[in-house]
Amino acid sequence: IHQFIRKAELKFKVKNVVNSTYDIETTTLKMGGFVTYTNLSSSISKVSHTAVSSDSTLETTEYVVSNSITVRVPNTKLDTTLMLISRNIEFLDYRIISADDVALKILANTLTQKRAKMGMSRINQNNNGNSAVDIITNLQSRADDAMIANLALSDQIQYSTIQLSIYQRESLKRELIANNQNIK
């Protein structure tokens, strides 16, 4: 039986990053998922000043708003979530979807746990003193590591990860500011 870890990565242009971010977050929640990361920022590309009078200057700022978002949704809702997110796309840079079958990794971890338990019971039967304690501790540590690895894989199977990089067209902000150099 296959057990897939499904992931999606998208980069696209939107009309308004802030509005699209809220839409993506709302869609994620409605699908039973959650946001694990978001980094909404504005990057200034140019600032210019134009004198409009002896005491006033027009400051023009050119900037780009972008956001990197990571969400997790139930595996069964990945396709629906991607379709709902796509309504925000003005231009798609790329979309990558991957599915990694981890059934053999889970089997290997389960077998490691069984071997460790069998080894511990054999050592307990022979009761070899202090060296047995070290061996049992080592075996238990291996079993614990395998169990934790399976839990992590199970979580990744149940919840797909979607990484989004969104941006919008460059924006302008104009502001009339005081020209302090000419004020006496």
Q: What is each PLM-predicted segment?
A:
Residues 1-169:
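Soluble oligomerization/assembly scaffold segments of membrane-associated complexes
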Residues 170-184:
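Extended, helix-rich structural scaffolds rather than catalytic motifs
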